[in-house]
Amino acid sequence: MGDCVLREEKKAEKRQELVDACLDCFVEKGLTVATTKDLCKAAKLQNGGIYYYFSTKEEIVLACAEEAISRIEKAAFGIVFEDISDIKSMTDHLGELADKMSPTMRFLVSVCVSREYGEKVKPSLVRLAARYPYYTGRIAEILGCTDEEVAPFVHLSILAINNYMIFAERALFDPQIEAVKKELSRLAERKGRNNG
């Protein structure tokens, strides 16, 4: 029994390594260009070896889309919770992150708009959206305001960062993120006055 559990854990660990390698391959080559052979090479497997871990290419693509969401989400909210005491620094770091994560977001968008995978990736997006209230609550708690006060700015930040990652155009990002910076700073200052 213990050997079976250990074997399954090792397989799950290997599968995660493969998802990481495949996502990097998709990001580099593109969803429609990357072949199974490319994915196997990226994962350091013999040709077709990836199917020991995944049943179909669709399963690989959807696992990679889920990982893309996870990478972007963890990186973005990691910055928010690390830097929120300095709103300007936080928004600057989010802009830098958007530059860095843009290729990953573009892969995710290509999955979302594809005829083949678009509907199948929606549950992952719904799960992501379901986590937004948690993040809103944490930010509100840190800033000493209500969820309702901060929610529009959390969502505007997400929209601004997503737009910037997709379109790589600062003109779309800067006005939105400046509005967020102004209002979050106002909320943070209010907390300072209330605590002072």
Region locations from a protein language model:
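Amphipathic alpha-helical linker/stalk segments
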Residues: 64-90
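Amphipathic, non-transmembrane alpha-helical scaffold segments
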Residues: 11, 15, 19, 61, ...
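Helical hydrophobic small-molecule/effector-binding pocket
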Residues: 87-113, 118-122
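N-terminal intrinsically disordered/low-complexity leader segments
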Residues: 1-12, 195-196
